[in-house]
Amino acid sequence: MNKIFLLFFALILLNSATFAQIKKSKKEKNQNVETVITDSVQWRKDHYVINRDSAYADPRIGLKKLMGGNRRFVEGKSIRPRQDAETIKKLEKGQEPFATIVGCSDSRVPNEMIFDQGLGDLFIIRTAGQVSAAASYGSMEFAVLKLKTKLIVVLGHTECGAVAAAVSRPEDVPGHIVTLINEIKQSVAKSSYLPGDPVNNAVRQNVIDQVMTLRDLDPILHKI
C-alpha cells in the first residue's frame, strides 16, 4: 500500500512538470485537475483519512480519526503523516494535538505508530498499566486547559505486563512496583468471575475503572 501512496504524489508532480512544459487548453487543464481531485478523494476514502482540523474541533471526529489510523496500521496502509520539515517548523510555534492518549508504557504499543498519526497530533501520557496519579492528572488538565484538547482516550492493550503481575498476585514486590499492582488489583477482582483470559479481562476492566475515575475528577476533567 505504500507504493500506492508514493504513486499518488508522483502523479501530481508529473502533472505539474507537464503543465510547465506543454501549453494546453483551459478545458484540458480543468479535466486534469478534476482527475487529480477525484483521485485524492478516493485515496482519502481508501485510507480512512479524516480532516485534522475537524478532528481537533470535534472529539467525535477525533475518535474516528484515531480509529481510521489504527485501521490503516492493522491493514498495512500506514501513511505516517505530518513528519516533514514544514510540519516540524510549524510546530516550533506551538502544538494543537487533537487527542490526549493515556496509555501503557509497554514498548510494543507506540501510540503514534498504532494510530498512524504524526508530529503534534497526540498528547501522550504513559505509565505501566496506564495507572494514573497526581502528575498524570495534571498533565491531562494541561492538555485540556492549555492545548484545548477535547478528546481523552484511555488505551489498554492485550497481554499487559502490569496487569498480568496484578493477576498473578506476587509476594515481596520490590520498590514502587507494588504501587502499580495495588492500583490494578481492584480491576482484577471485578473481572475475576468473567470467562476467558483473566489478564485480558482485567485489562478491559482496568480501562473502564480509569475512565470512571477521570469522570469523577473535579473540576476540569469532569467536564470532558
Q: What is the predicted role of each segment?
A:
Residues 95-100, 106-112:
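Active-site alpha/beta core segments
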Residues 103-108, 128-131, 157:
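Short glycine-enriched loops at secondary-structure junctions
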Residues 108-125:
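Catalytic core of membrane glycerolipid acyltransferases/transacylases, capturing the structured
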Residues 66, 101, 125, 154:
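Divalent metal-coordination and catalytic microenvironments
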Residues 150:
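Short acidic/polar active-site loop segments enriched in Thr and Asp
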Residues 22-94, 120, 130-138, 142-147, ...:
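Divalent-metal-activated hydrolytic enzyme cores
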Residues 1-25:
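Bacterial Sec-dependent N-terminal signal peptides
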Residues 92-93, 100, 157-158:
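Catalytic-core segments of thiol-dependent peptidases
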